[in-house]
Amino acid sequence: MGYNVAVVGATGNVGREMLGILAERSFPADEIVALASRRSQGVDVSYGERTLRVKALEHHDFSGTDICLMSAGSAVSKEYSPRIAAAGAVVIDNSSAWRYDSDVPLIVPEVNADAAAGFRKRGIIANPNCSTAQLVVALKPLHDRARIKRVVVATYQSVSGAGKEAMDELFTQTKAVFQIDEITANKFPKRIAFNLIPQIDVFMEDGYTREEWKMVVETKKILDPKIKLTATCVRVPVFISHCEAVSIEFERPITADEARELLRNAPGCLVIDSREPGGYVTPYEAAGEDATYISRIRDDATVENGLSMWIVSDNLRKGAALNAIQIAECLVNRKLITAKRKAA
């Protein structure tokens, strides 16, 4: 028996990726329902070779739903996720609404799949921030070997992390530069075309942005609360894939060669690291791929036990949609949920 799956936010960047990945990975679904706001009702979206007609979220009956993949933002999730869970579905939420709730597991399957069983408290599992997801996938095998003390990370985050309107703004502004037209910034605080913006999300009282705060708190919750982390998050004029320049200090000795071998054998990781021109991965190459790519692995001579590296991943896939579906697969494969209903 397959599962009845609802995708909420099916017309957005991540929602569309979710539908595509469900089909790609042949997720055992008897029924897939595409849901969005009332203004998107009737829009067609792709699910593999099939076309689904989007239905309105507010009118949907979730009593027959087993798994709900939620990607409609925090406000919608806060309103609907508890209702959907109360109807008997497991909600896997991509927003930040539930990540910091102690009763809601925050899951990256390659890192802390065992914690997924905690969904029974609220009926909700949280997906981490896109930048956190790829970071902890790479950190996990290194932490297991040498115990991480401190991480310093600078992110280079693509505009798709801010939604379709942000991608449209980069395209429009880039075209305007070449046509010598006026450039208007709407989605970002400054123009993004041919520029970098060292602000993602709002500023907090201590000078960090909320995006930077998310990376700190989420890494601690997923991997180890003892890890110290500081982040600088930057928006860059790239459509898809996030990059991270990471320096790590360990409690125990570990060499670049040892790290390279560990990462080559770690789930979800793909090492591309040749010390020659082009011997690394860029955001262009990672787009559309599932792996977390690690390059530029090297010893950091500024600390006793240190490494530096370059991490790249498709933020719409591992950073969002793929991770959510891997969580659903984890629930199924570990028999944490049972398909109790057949599609009507």
What is each residue range found by the language model?
Residues 1-192, 228, 256, 261, ...:
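N-terminal Rossmann-like NAD(P) cofactor-binding subdomain of oxidoreductases
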Residues 227-344:
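C-terminal active-site/capping subdomain that shapes the small-molecule cofactor and substrate pocket
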